[in-house]
C-alpha cells in the first residue's frame, strides 16, 4: 500500500460520510413536511383570498407554518405587506 492509496481511501470514506449526512438531512426534511395536516394548503389559499380583499399581495408573500411543541400546535402566519 502506497502513501497515495492511504489518502485516497480516507478521502472516499470522508465523502461517503458527508453524503450520508446530507441524505439524512433531506429525509428528515421530507418527513417533517409529510407530518403537516392536509388542510394546511387550503388554509393558506383561503387566508390569501381574505387578505387580498384589503391588500394586493402575491402567493409568495404569505407563509403559513404549523409547528408542534408537545401537546400544543402553533400556527404561524408571515405576510410581506407592500409599501404604501
UniProtKB/Swiss-Prot annotation:
- Cysteine-cysteine disulfides: none
Tagged with keyword Zinc: no
Instruction: Give the record's keywords alphabetically.
Output: Cell cycle, Cell division
**BP GO annotations:** division septum site selection; regulation of division septum assembly
Q: Output the Pfam families linked to this UniProt entry.
A: MinE
Task: Look up the record and report any one GO term of the cellular component aspect.
Answer: plasma membrane
Q: Does the keyword Plastid apply?
A: no
Family designation: Belongs to the MinE family.
Q: What does this protein do?
A: Prevents the cell division inhibition by proteins MinC and MinD at internal division sites while permitting inhibition at polar sites. This ensures cell division at the proper site by restricting the formation of a division septum at the midpoint of the long axis of the cell.
The record ties this protein, via HAMAP family, to: MinE
| Full protein name | Cell division topological specificity factor
Amino acid at each position: 500500500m502506497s502513501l497515495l492509496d492511504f489518502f485516497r481511501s480516507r478521502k472516499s470514506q470522508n465523502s461517503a460520510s458527508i453524503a450520508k449526512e446530507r441524505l439524512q438531512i433531506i429525509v428528515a426534511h421530507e418527513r417533517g413536511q409529510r407530518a403537516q395536516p392536509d388542510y394546511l394548503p387550503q388554509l393558506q389559499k383561503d387566508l390569501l383570498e381574505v387578505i387580498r380583499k384589503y391588500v394586493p399581495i402575491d402567493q409568495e408573500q404569505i407563509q403559513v407554518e404549523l409547528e408542534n411543541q408537545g401537546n400544543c400546535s402553533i400556527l404561524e402566519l408571515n405576510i410581506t405587506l407592500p409599501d404604501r
